[in-house]
Amino acid sequence: MRIKLLLPLFALALALTLAACSNKGDQKPRPNIVFIMSDDHAYQAISAYSDHLTQTPNIDRIANEGMLFSNACVTNSICAPSRATILTGKHCHLHGKIDNRFPFDTTQVTFPQLFQAAGYQTAMFGKLHFGNNPKGIDEFKILPGQGAYYNPDFNTNDGKIRIEGYTTDVITDLTMDWMKNRRDPDVPFLLFFLHKAPHREWLPAERHYKEFTKKTFPEPPTLFDDYEGRGSAAREAEMNILLHQNWAGDSKLRPEVLDELGITPASNWDKRAMQNKYNRFTEEQLAAWNAVYDPIIEDFKQRYPTMTEKEQMSWKYQRYMQDYLGSIAAVDDGVGVLLDYLDEAGLSENTIVVYTSDQGFYLGEHGWFDKRFIYDESFKTPLLVKWPGTVKAGSKNDQMVQNMDFAQTFLDIAGIEAPSDMQGESIVPLLKGDIKGWDRDAVYYHYYEYPAVHMVKRHYGIVTREYKLAHFYYDVDEWELYDRKNDPMEMQNEYNNPEYAKVVAELKQKLDDLRVKYGDSAELDQKYIDLYNKK
């Protein structure tokens, strides 16, 4: 046991020594890094990717002045595991945070520790989602767990505090206060600007819900998907907007209205979720909320008795989009505030700005909300990078990059040696426009949280530009193959199609190779199943 504990400590000591030595003799000012991450922000809801749903002019500025990655993806599409992967540069089976329940292996070296040791000042504001004392961070104010949308609590260096206001705006204010008043102007900085929004249950700021509740959004062509042509995982997942999205907690009906109309709650926390929000509001906030949402509720009460299931689905989809996209609007506002300050303070030229999400999200595609699957809407994530003087403004990149690449990329940018056990690759060559040396032609994915909320089965898989092969396991043994070019919506599983037999064989071999490369195995699959069943 003593040897097991000493090895990570030795690795950290070695990494910190290398980090401290890496910048000796470096005459050029080391760049600042601003890492902006929202929660569950679908790439479909960023106008730099597609403007069919909403406009995000400030986030788009990062793309317009930098690079947009069209094939960025995650290793495990769920909040805390994704964040642990970003911090460690490793797949989940190595850092231990395989799902939102499992603990993070705190012996792991995180890249902020290396920045701190190399003389960077480090700060983190917003949602981390695991742990109350992030390693390698000089100053932090982070939401406990998921956090609230209004009048949030924060864990800080000095204990817990509560701040009145809308959480997205509060996080922006905390970030800007540090930038303007407590940042040492003579020392390079690593700043984490981490938003809770637009995570479920999607409460917009007052200025935005007044606007977005008046909008109507186009329905995706697969909103009424019947899952024919897919396996049991898609059919049995509990992510359908009509069946599984909460009437009160998500669609914002008053709990008593469900009783009045005889609506069965979608979950055992449906009514409680909305009541908790009401209890969180100040009197002024509640009055403003009711002034907008009460008429929506009254209109629904009049219409509901004659609504078909299809009409109910369409109504819930519109309510979902109004609040989800309304929540994003405040994130975009905050990004604009930060970008403006960087310009005004003369910091832009030596500051790398990154915008991403911890994963993608379903906005009605396949009738779903939430994430988890290897299918594109949850597997892919937005990634925009602005680096003046290095990244060509308005450029695009379609190479396959993953969130586990972020740690090594940031370390590379800062000239800090990366630990040898990190599994990603620096994307600095791609940022410089050099794709010749980038030879990644496939990525590995593994999702673990089952049986649990949303009931998305455990699966791992391989994704190439042309195909996607996934193995669903635990209570099933099913394979799925999708032709990404000919079936971009992933509607038809071709695994048993004889025409794809050669493709399946090649991908299975390549998948086995990736599992070996990244240290994953059937033994680890069973280990995590056994540990999960003990909890």
What do these predicted regions represent?
Residues 2, 8-12, 16, 21-473, ...:
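Formylglycine-dependent sulfatase
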Residues 485:
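Residues forming the ATP-binding cleft of Hanks-type serine/threonine protein kinase domains
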